[in-house]
Design a protein with these regions (language model features):
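Extracellular beta-rich repeat passengers
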Residues: 1-182
């Protein structure tokens, strides 16, 4: 799916979204100052809302919204998420309960992964060149990550608001400032 200026995708409904491969391509030259949220207060170039998903793959390249991908009140299993060149946050997960096999995020203008009020199990998380945080966890979230790698970000992991994170294997944590902060 090719997104043009001011276009967004909103995926919602009953039932299960199963075995889909979703590829979103934006235009990094079409940044608009007031595009951080739309008239429905949606912040994602692609927003999944209130659905169950199983065995899907999502990729996003050159998307300029507040969140390249936003998972809001979603449950299920995601095989792969790949995000390259997001103007602000790469992936925003709110109020969700998910198992994710692989997350790869590169070149985010803010946080690579922002998690709020969610329960997540992530097998492999890799990020490179996140301007702010590689991984931000807040609002009573519980996150388990088997393998974590963060390169060239300001902060590798920030945990706040009574949230918990467990990281089993830490590989290649090379960032500008802090490796782990807890607020």
């Amino acid at each position: 799916i090719k997104l043009s200026k001011k276009s967004k995708i909103f995926i919602y409904g009953t039932g299960v979204l199963k075995s889909w491969n979703i590829n979103i391509v934006g235009n990094k030259d079409e940044v608009e100052d007031n595009f951080r949220q739309d008239s429905n207060l949606l912040t994602g170039c692609v927003t999944f809302f209130g659905i169950e998903i199983y065995d899907i793959e999502i990729s996003s390249i050159n998307n300029m919204c507040e969140d390249a991908i936003n998972l809001l009140n979603v449950k299920g299993f995601i095989r792969d998420i790949n995000i390259i060149n997001s103007h602000f946050d790469g992936l925003d997960i709110d109020f969700s309960n998910l198992e994710i096999q692989n997350i790869n995020i590169e070149n985010s203008g803010n946080d690579c992964l922002d998690i709020s009020s969610s329960i997540l199990e992530i097998d492999t998380f890799y990020s490179n060149n996140c301007v702010d945080k590689s991984l931000s966890i807040g609002e009573k979230s519980t996150v388990k990550i088997t393998t974590f790698e963060s390169l060239q970000s300001n902060i590798a992991v920030a945990v706040k608001d009574s949230s918990n994170v467990t990281i089993s294997n830490k590989l290649g944590i090379e960032n500008d400032m802090l490796s782990l902060i807890h607020i």
